[in-house]
């Protein structure tokens, strides 16, 4: 017997969202379907009963999967089934994870698996904006401990109006695209891209999103109450010893505070912190440590956190000795590698990015074949974070979710600065060689430098900065930190990344770990971030005042041509024969496509002569022969009555024996013309019915003195009953010996 419970959320614009539970996946700890129009997602959540031994973190795993059947498509590939997660699916997982994770109890360490599956879509509504709502609702109807609910919505500003959960079409016209995750009371997560907007405009988008989220959270609470899942399961995942906690604090805090205010570097500071806890543990036997080591590690982590936070709040001293608004020292080097088309090193403190740029042609475009997005990308950014960047001794595996997420943020920060008509496909590769905080922002800065070094005429240079927050008493006492370290990110209350030009914000990413963060604090953080990124932008402009005027010598050259749609087939040729011939003869690469009723041809090569050669051949194909013009030609075949001459690519005409010279020849052999010989010819006429070309060579030669026009050959042949000559050619044009010219 089904016990189906549902709640409907009115979006206020004629659209609604329905949350339903009790019908599908009933063996999961919690399961809901979320429906908006023809878009249907199923979210399930399952949690282990006990914590993993020795686990001191929240082992949450979020999976988001889109089925190709949702839109009535077959997957690509040999197996014709869904494969590994796409970048889009991974990014959606991260959006959901970042909003959920802070709201699980600190002492809850059982494995939790959240699965969100797209089962139906119409290509109009965006399902990623519903994934957070679905995941939270599944937790709400379960007995898993969770201090929610939360929800996520996308807000876009289109034509000056903020729209909640816009369609794909609306998003294409938006100058603000924000994904916001929040509880009824607090913002938890923000991510988005913008077209150089002001801080106040971004904050207004967050406010609009939060109002919509409050309605969705209320609906989840009502759903949970209707289901009767108000009582959460009991758990005991941590063993505590309050006397030991006090002992760790009493014996270690003063020394930890001294290290926190010493202003030392990352590794020296880490070793000093480690020495304190090792000396504390030395007072216990191995048997005692077997019981107490895990608790000591937990309690000492709290001591480190308290020491760092108190040093900042009470004395304004940061771990590396900087003031709250101070940016770490920056050094920059451009054109640092000879091989890439552009390169730059950006180092800020102990964070360093070596970024390169590769320029490509249309054939290098990335094909994106997602369930709801089939397109080609011309601007790519890849972010790599090897273990050695933090001094870790471990193997490097494939690209992880973190790398995809950080690369996506940098990509969104820079992509609107690439001119829409830029002919090159651009790939930016950031390799993080050192990391101690805000490596994604180093990627943005190094990306700007490398693009300009490559000669990419970006609209404006972009810089980025990561902001942090230390707060207490519900935000009544707080310190905003500019250009945070890795430890300040880990031990602080906020990680707020902002990128932009001198005129406005281009991208942002924010994760908040505490309750009670007011909009006033956000405003102050954004203003401080603006001052910081403008300082960094100034350093970029000092090191590289102008974009390189031209591409580097070894970069590919690209030219574009526009031709009439009717000529596309002529340029390609049967089976691609003509376009392949152009590429073989010129050494250039030629791509052609129809755009807006025109043929757009992209010609690329390593040097200008090969491009010019290809352009010349294409112009010859699309050129319209003009009567009276002289053309260089090549004899393609010799017949008894004359020669066929190709005078433009793909265009042949008949050079009759009578038009070879002013003197008369009895046979074509007497002319000494050979197949493959190059001669100049003049176009005398174009037959209006057949389009055949009549050529002459003799009109280009000087007429002999006393020349007498001979009697027309056709009349004599007609009297003699002859079956040869021009008359027979016109009548028997299909024969191999009397073929018609190509036009």
Curated annotation (Swiss-Prot):
Per the database record, which ranges form the S1 motif domain? Answer: 628-698
Q: What class of enzyme is it?
A: transferase
According to its UniProt entry, one GO biological process term is:
mRNA catabolic process
Family matches, as SMART domains: KH, S1
Q: What is its main location?
A: cytoplasm
Q: What does the record give as cofactor?
A: Mg(2+)
Keywords, A to Z, come to:
Cytoplasm, Magnesium, Metal-binding, Nucleotidyltransferase, RNA-binding, Transferase
**Is Methyltransferase given among the entry's keywords?**
no
GO cellular component, alphabetical, reads:
cytosol
Q: Where is the KH domain?
A: 556-618
E.C. code:
2.7.7.8
What's a single GO MF annotation on this record?
polyribonucleotide nucleotidyltransferase activity
Q: Which residues bind Mg(2+)?
A: 489, 495
Q: Which InterPro entries match?
A: ExoRNase_PH_dom1, ExoRNase_PH_dom2, ExoRNase_PH_dom2_sf, KH_dom, KH_dom_type_1, KH_dom_type_1_sf, NA-bd_OB-fold, PNPase
Q: By its UniProt entry, which PROSITE patterns does this protein fall under? A: KH_TYPE_1, S1
| Residue ranges, annotated region (Disordered) | 704-743
Which compartments does it reside in?
Cytoplasm
Kindly state which reaction or reactions the protein catalyses. Answer: RNA(n+1) + phosphate = RNA(n) + a ribonucleoside 5'-diphosphate
Pfam families with a match to the protein in the record: KH_1, PNPase, RNase_PH, RNase_PH_C, S1
| Xref: HAMAP family | PNPase
Tell me the protein family, please.
Belongs to the polyribonucleotide nucleotidyltransferase family.
- NCBIfam families in the cross-refs: polynuc_phos, PRK11824.1
Q: What does this protein do?
A: Involved in mRNA degradation. Catalyzes the phosphorolysis of single-stranded polyribonucleotides processively in the 3'- to 5'-direction.
Q: What is this protein called?
A: Polyribonucleotide nucleotidyltransferase
């Amino acid at each position: 017997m089904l016990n189906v419970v549902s709640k409907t959320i009115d979006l206020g614009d004629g659209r609604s969202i329905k949350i339903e539970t009790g019908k599908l996946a009933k063996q999961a700890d919690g399961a809901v379907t979320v429906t908006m129009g023809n878009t249907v997602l199923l979210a399930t959540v399952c949690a282990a009963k006990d914590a993993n031994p020795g686990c001191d973190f929240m082992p949450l795993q979020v999976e988001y999967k889109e089925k190709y059947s949702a839109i009535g498509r077959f997957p690509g590939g040999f197996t014709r089934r869904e494969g590994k997660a796409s970048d889009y699916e991974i990014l959606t997982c991260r959006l959901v994870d970042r909003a959920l994770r802070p709201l699980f109890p600190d002492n809850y360490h059982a494995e939790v698996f959240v699965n969100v599956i797209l089962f139906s879509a119409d290509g109009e509504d965006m399902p990623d904006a519903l994934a957070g709502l679905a995941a939270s609702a599944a937790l709400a109807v379960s007995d898993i401990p969770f201090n929610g609910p939360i929800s996520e919505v996308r807000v876009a500003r289109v034509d000056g109006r903020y729209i909640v959960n816009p369609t794909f079409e609306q998003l294409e016209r938006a100058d603000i695209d924000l994904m916001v995750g929040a509880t009824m009371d607090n913002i938890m997560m923000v991510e988005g891209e913008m077209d150089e907007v002001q801080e106040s405009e971004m904050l207004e988008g967050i406010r609009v999103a939060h109002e919509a989220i409050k309605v969705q959270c209320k609906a989840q609470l009502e759903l949970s109450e209707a289901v009767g899942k108000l009582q959460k399961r009991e758990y005991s995942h941590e063993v505590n010893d309050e006397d030991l906690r006090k002992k760790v604090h009493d014996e270690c805090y003063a020394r930890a505070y001294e290290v926190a205010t010493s202003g030392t570097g990352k590794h020296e500071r880490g070793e000093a912190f480690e020495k304190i806890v090792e000396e504390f543990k030395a007072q216990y036997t191995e048997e005692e440590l077997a019981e107490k080591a895990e608790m000591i590690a937990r309690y000492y982590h709290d001591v480190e956190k308290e020491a760092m936070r108190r040093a900042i709040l009470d004395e304004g001293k940061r771990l590396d000795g900087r003031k709250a608004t101070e940016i770490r020292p920056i050094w920059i080097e451009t054109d640092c590698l000879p091989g890439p088309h552009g390169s730059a090193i950006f180092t800020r403190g102990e964070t360093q990015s070596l970024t390169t740029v590769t320029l490509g042609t249309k054939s290098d475009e990335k094909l994106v074949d997602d369930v709801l997005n089939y397109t080609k990308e011309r601007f790519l950014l890849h972010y790599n974070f090897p273990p050695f960047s933090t001094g870790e001794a471990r193997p490097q595996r494939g690209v992880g979710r973190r790398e995809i997420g950080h690369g996506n943020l940098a990509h969104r920060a820079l992509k609107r600065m690439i001119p829409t008509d830029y002919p090159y496909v651009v790939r930016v590769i950031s390799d993080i060689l050192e990391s101690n905080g805000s490596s994604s922002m180093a990627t943005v800065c190094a990306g700007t430098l490398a693009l300009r070094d490559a000669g990419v005429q970006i609209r404006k240079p972009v810089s980025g900065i990561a902001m942090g927050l230390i707060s207490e008493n519900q935000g009544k006492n707080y310190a905003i930190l500019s250009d945070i370290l890795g430890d300040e990110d880990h031990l602080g209350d906020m990680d707020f990344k902002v990128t932009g030009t001198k005129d406005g914000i281009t991208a942002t990413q924010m994760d908040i770990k505490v309750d009670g963060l007011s909009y006033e604090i956000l405003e102050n953080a954004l203003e401080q971030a603006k001052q910081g990124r403008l300082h960094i932008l100034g350093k970029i402009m000092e090191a590289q005042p102008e974009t390189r005027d031209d591409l580097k010598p070894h970069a590919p050259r690209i030219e574009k041509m526009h031709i009439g749609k009717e000529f596309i087939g002529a340029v390609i040729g049967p089976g691609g024969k003509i376009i392949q011939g152009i590429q073989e003869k010129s050494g250039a690469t030629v791509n052609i496509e129809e755009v807006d009723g025109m043929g757009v041809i992209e010609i690329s090569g390593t040097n200008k002569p090969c491009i010019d050669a290809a352009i010349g051949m294409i112009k010859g194909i699309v050129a319209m022969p003009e009567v009276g013009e002289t053309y260089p030609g090549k004899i393609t075949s010799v017949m008894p009555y004359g020669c066929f001459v190709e005078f433009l690519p793909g265009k042949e005409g008949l050079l009759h024996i009578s038009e070879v010279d002013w003197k008369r020849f009895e046979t074509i052999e007497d002319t000494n013309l050979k197949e493959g010989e190059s001669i100049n010819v003049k176009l005398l006429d174009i037959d209006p019915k057949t389009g055949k070309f009549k050529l002459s060579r003799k009109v280009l030669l000087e007429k002999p003195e006393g020349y007498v026009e001979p009697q027309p050959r056709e009349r004599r042949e007609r009297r003699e009953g002859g079956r040869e000559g021009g008359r027979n050619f016109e009548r028997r044009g299909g024969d191999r010996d009397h073929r018609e010219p190509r036009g």
